[in-house]
Curated annotation (Swiss-Prot):
It holds the Pfam family MoCF_biosynth. The gene is cinA. SMART domains: MoCF_biosynth. It comes from Bacillus cereus (strain ZK / E33L). SUPFAM superfamilies: CinA-like, Molybdenum cofactor biosynthesis proteins. This is Putative competence-damage inducible protein. Belongs to the CinA family. It comes from the Bacteria. Gene3D superfamilies: 3.30.70.2860, CinA-like, MoaB/Mog-like domain.
Amino acid sequence: MNAEIIAVGTELLLGQIANTNAQFLSEKLASIGINVYYHTVVGDNNKRLQQAIEVAEERADMLIFTGGLGPTKDDLTKETIASSLAEELVYDEKALASIGDYFKRTGREFTENNKKQALVLDGATVFANDHGMAPGMGLNKNGKVYILLPGPPKEMKPMYVSYVEPFLRNFTTGENIYSRVLRFFGIGESQLEVKVQDLIDGQTNPTIAPLANDGEVTLRLTAKHQNVDEAEKLIQHVEDLILERVGEFFYGYDQEFLHYKAIELLKKKGLTLACAESLTGGLFGNQVTESAGVSSVFKGGVICYHNDVKQHVLHVPEEVLSTDGAVSKECARYLAENVKELLKADIGISFTGVAGPDASEHKEPGTVFVGLAIKDEPTVVFPLNLSGSRQQIRERSAKYGFYHLYKKLEEI
């Protein structure tokens, strides 16, 4: 079955809010074997919404609407669909009572326009709104399935999970879709794709979808099967083939982000970390502290943006700063070693470089050095040559820091 998601709301077209509902629904629908081929966004306008419905009916078996179920005059979704299908709108008594109870509890007047939220298409299956007022609904008519959902994600998402997905399973073949995301760092999308090109060209089930995002590459493996164990076998076979070729760049699955993986390894090995940040200005430390319980492994950091701090707090020799410069391998080495000693940590990591947009110390933007000092190990400095905006260079530098930290921790 093929679906189209139609998001209704002028605020979406104006860019005032992001259409996160479509992303959520697409992922959920794919997991139960419903293909989403189109996303449509239309404003709060009866005529244009009617046109969107007519177009969607020509190319989709299922039309899923989000938004436009509220109490105001510009909430037109139910009325427009009712007119299009020649269906009446009737009050759902449970929804009407629930909305009335809310106004009674809050001491507010239950006005006619708020009663409008309890209207549903005659004959539709009603989805209770446990986190808001307007119920959702589903109607099978003329060989098409129409699903109407509230716009606020805090209402739509739990409604989908509790009521909509069980309803939609009545229209699926029983063949589910299972996905696994492989995460890679330290290799570009084009390089990775070349190494697995024959697998991509020959893909059937599972499929392989590469995606580059903010300095890393993911491969989404997607298999269709009625049985989850068989789907897992299909995915595992292709994963094994991929990792035989590019396993050195692989670091995790799905939502296992690089900084979380590095912190997990620190905890596992019982080692502590300190950071010295010039270029990144605290970005690395900020990401470290996103992990719960990180105080057991993170001693702290020094933001050493000015050379005075590098020299007088972290004891980078004046001759290094005047001869090699702050953006240098030698400076990165001293920063990593000395922050480790200063904060009595097992590991020190440092970041120094040129974020841009202008050159500094006759070095171009994107020139970066990441230092890594680990007890009982020789200090290593990783030179980087990055591209992008000032913020992208800073963020990618921090990510490379986590990557090199993770890889070194795997070795020891």
